């Protein structure tokens, strides 16, 4: 993230830690949109199926992905209105992304690859059989047959939107904590990854068990390192978040 100056509008004022925490909170609340859908279906029908009929399932997943994408975009615009750009084209010292030194890129790529490996290997080591993406596709194929590709495309739209919000939580939470913690070297601690890991890990613990919850925490911490070493830019953090959560 980079300070870009407060725009010349009547109600403009600089962002503070409380504002950044508010953005992170709104992003967390935005993740609950799927619960709103399930809750509505439960109220109307008295039950929530694992999978809806193909047409409705595709509409739900694609709709959620689009809503999440616009939520993340709205948070970016809101942040810029308060003088902070979460999508800078360069690093905090003014260099372009392409000019990041090889050590920073080596750390970014190493942590990103490590996150993917952890997402695949750690659940298996802790007793969770199978690979999540393969099992997901097998479930969709069993339910929808040859038309399962429609559901897969809708799920990918959902994944992109959801990961945009997850990366937003990480970025804004990191900046909020940095505004409060002033210890020497605090800027190198992956605060955003720890916060995101706590949030998504708690959800994973309730829905998928402790093995996936631990894997989620480790993966999010590594994504936090990616965010720090990548200049705190969502341009770098968001794609790697998508890559990691695609296999988690």
Model-predicted regions and their roles:
Residues 1-24, 79-97:
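N-terminal juxtamembrane cytosolic/stromal segments of multi-pass membrane proteins
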Residues 12-16, 100-101, 140-148, 182-189:
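Helix-boundary and loop/linker segments of multi-pass membrane transporters
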Residues 16-86, 106-115:
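Alpha-helical transmembrane segments in multi-pass membrane proteins
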Residues 28-39, 116-124, 196-206, 241-248:
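Aromatic-anchored segments of alpha-helical transmembrane domains
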Residues 48-56, 137-141, 212-223:
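Non-cytosolic membrane-interface motifs at loop->transmembrane helix junctions
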Residues 51-57, 142-157:
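Short aromatic-rich membrane-water interface segments that cap or initiate transmembrane helices
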Residues 113-135, 155-171, 175:
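Transmembrane alpha-helix/helix-exit interface in multi-pass inner-membrane proteins
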Residues 148-248:
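Transmembrane helix-loop-helix hairpins at the membrane interface
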């Amino acid at each position: 993230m980079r300070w870009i100056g407060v725009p010349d509008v009547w109600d403009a004022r600089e962002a503070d830690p409380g504002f950044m925490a508010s953005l992170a909170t709104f992003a967390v609340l935005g993740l609950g949109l799927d619960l709103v859908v399930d809750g509505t279906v439960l109220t109307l029908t008295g039950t929530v199926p694992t999978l809806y009929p193909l047409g409705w399932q595709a509409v739900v997943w694609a709709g959620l992905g689009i809503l999440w994408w616009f939520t993340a975009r709205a948070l970016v615009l809101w942040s810029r209105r308060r003088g902070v750009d979460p999508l800078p084209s360069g690093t905090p010292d003014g260099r372009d992304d392409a000019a990041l030194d090889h050590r920073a890129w080596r750390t970014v790529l190493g942590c990103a690859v490590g996150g993917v490996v952890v997402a695949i290997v750690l659940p298996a080591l802790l007793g969770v059989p199978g690979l999540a993406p393969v099992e997901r596709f097998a479930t969709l194929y069993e339910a929808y047959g040859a038309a399962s590709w429609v559901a897969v495309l809708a799920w990918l739209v959902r994944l992109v939107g959801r990961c945009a919000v997850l990366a937003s939580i990480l970025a804004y939470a990191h900046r909020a904590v940095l505004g409060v913690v002033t210890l020497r070297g605090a800027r190198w601690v992956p605060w955003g990854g720890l916060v995101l890991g706590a949030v998504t890990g708690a959800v994973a613990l309730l829905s998928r068990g402790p093995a996936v919850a631990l894997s989620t925490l480790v993966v999010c911490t590594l994504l936090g390192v990616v965010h720090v070493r990548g200049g705190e830019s969502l341009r770098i953090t968001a794609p790697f978040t998508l890559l990691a959560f695609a296999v988690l």
